[in-house]
């Protein structure tokens, strides 16, 4: 299903007959964690119930007050359930909700297979999270033909081979491609070329603009700016006066201006990361640490799946005023042990958080290598070896039997339901 069509020429012809020379795809897995779990269940048993068709979520420790929704089905979304929402709140909205515990090893494997398909067709890929990537398709029109037709074939191939759907947004830059992929879901291809902004982009509420948080949107509305189009036409100096440097970003984004290039990381600098946007404000350290643990589980599983090690951990914090704070720590030795990554993430968070209410948390790693340089005294070396073997055993058990087979204590109650 596509939202528009165009005829390729020497470049890519966009509505209005303008020839562009950059072609960017943003490929985003629909409800990734839930889709990957559903695809696995259907591969194992074709008669299994598809979680995507019922009121279901992937969630952490349901018995603890800070267990959160990690992914939701389309029908669960209709109840107003949001990613990052406490499971207790989700239950209140939908009493018959099916809660499935996370399987981080599955997510790592599914993400790798997803990216491998993109690597086969795209000259340059920038993986921006476990379930989404930008593809610079510039110059591929003569090889693949019409970009929209090719994007449709690509999403259909992903579904046929891997069992889950994706949305693909197409434009001349990363910002507009990402906005396009967020249009109607699931299993869609959408375009948002510059000539289409007046019709598809500017009528959207200002909250829809990527990078415009709720607090910023509220301030914009107080200034009479309610749509992206109104923001695009707003006085730039007025925006700078009210929002400082963010005013430039808002004005440029509303006008579809983005100079960010699709950049493939070299293997030597490859990193792993994951983040979650929260629909509620996190205001206590315990809750934040619990969310960090879930993120580190996924990141650690991906690192081990690639047989890699990392030596830098960074925590990203975005508060409810959209202020970004990052704290990075270098590890004494390269590792792929979840506990070590989590320990560093908590330390970085504790050092970097200014106690402002949090709306997004992220964990990323860098300086990846294919060798470990763990250096400990005899006691610590023994502890590391035990943790490493434990992580490896957990990965193998989860890979073979699913995440239900073995869980951390803080997730145990969820698995019993």
Cite the ranges covered by each PLM segment.
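Gly/Gly-Pro- and Ser/Thr-rich, intrinsically disordered tail segments characteristic of DNA damage-repair
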Residues: 2-252, 301, 384-417
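DNA-contacting surface of Y-family translesion DNA polymerases
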Residues: 14-19, 208, 218-358
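Short, charged/polar surface micro-motifs in flexible loops or helix N-caps
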Residues: 30-32, 62-65, 320-323, 368-371
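Acidic, metal-coordinating catalytic segment for phosphate/diphosphate chemistry
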Residues: 36, 333-417
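Short, hydrophobic beta-strand segments
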Residues: 133-139, 326-329, 374-380
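A glycine-rich phosphate-binding loop feature that marks nucleotide/adenosyl-phosphate handling sites
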Residues: 172-175, 254, 309-320, 358-369, ...
């Amino acid at each position: 299903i596509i939202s528009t069509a165009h005829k390729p020429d020497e470049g890519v012809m966009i509505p209005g007959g303008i020839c562009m020379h950059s072609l960017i795809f943003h490929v985003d897995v629909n409800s990734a964690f839930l889709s990957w779990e559903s695809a696995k269940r259907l591969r194992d048993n074709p008669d299994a119930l598809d979680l995507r068709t019922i009121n279901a979520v992937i969630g952490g420790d349901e018995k603890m007050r800070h267990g959160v929704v990690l992914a939701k089905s389309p029908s669960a979304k209709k109840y107003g359930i949001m990613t990052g929402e406490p499971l207790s709140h989700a239950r209140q909205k939908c009493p018959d909700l099916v809660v499935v515990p996370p399987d981080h090893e599955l997510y790592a494997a599914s993400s790798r297979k997803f990216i491998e398909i993109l690597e086969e067709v795209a000259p340059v890929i920038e993986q921006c999270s476990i379930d989404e990537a930008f593809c610079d398709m510039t110059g591929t029109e003569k090889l693949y033909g019409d970009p929209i037709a090719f994007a449709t074939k690509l999403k259909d191939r992903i579904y046929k081979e891997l069992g889950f759907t994706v949305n693909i947004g197409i434009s001349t830059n990363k910002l507009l491609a990402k906005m396009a992929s967020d249009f109607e879901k699931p299993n869609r291809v959408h375009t948002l070329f510059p000539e289409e902004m007046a019709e598809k982009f500017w009528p959207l509420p200002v909250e829809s603009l990527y990078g415009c948080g709720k607090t910023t949107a509220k301030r914009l509305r107080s200034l009479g700016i309610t749509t992206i189009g109104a923001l695009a036409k707003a006085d730039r100096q007025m925006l700078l006066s009210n929002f400082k440097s963010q005013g430039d970003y808002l004005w440029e984004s509303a006008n579809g201006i983005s100079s960010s290039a699709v950049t493939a990381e070299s293997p030597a600098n490859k990193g792993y990361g994951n983040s979650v946007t929260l629909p509620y404000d996190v205001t206590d350290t315990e809750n934040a640490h619990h969310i960090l643990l879930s993120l580190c589980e996924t990141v650690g599983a991906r690192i081990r799946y690639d047989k890699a090690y990392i030596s830098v951990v960074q925590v990203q914090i975005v508060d409810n005023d959209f202020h970004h704070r990052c704290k990075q720590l270098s590890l004494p030795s390269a590792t792929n042990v979840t506990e070590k990554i989590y320990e560093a993430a908590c330390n970085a968070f504790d050092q970097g958080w200014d106690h402002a209410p949090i709306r997004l948390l992220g964990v990323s790693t860098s300086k990846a290598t294919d060798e470990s340089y763990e250096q400990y005294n005899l006691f610590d070396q023994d502890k590391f070896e035990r943790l490493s073997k434990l992580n490896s055993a957990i990965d193998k058990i989860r890979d073979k039997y699913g995440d239900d087979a073995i869980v951390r204590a803080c997730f145990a109650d969820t698995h019993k339901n």
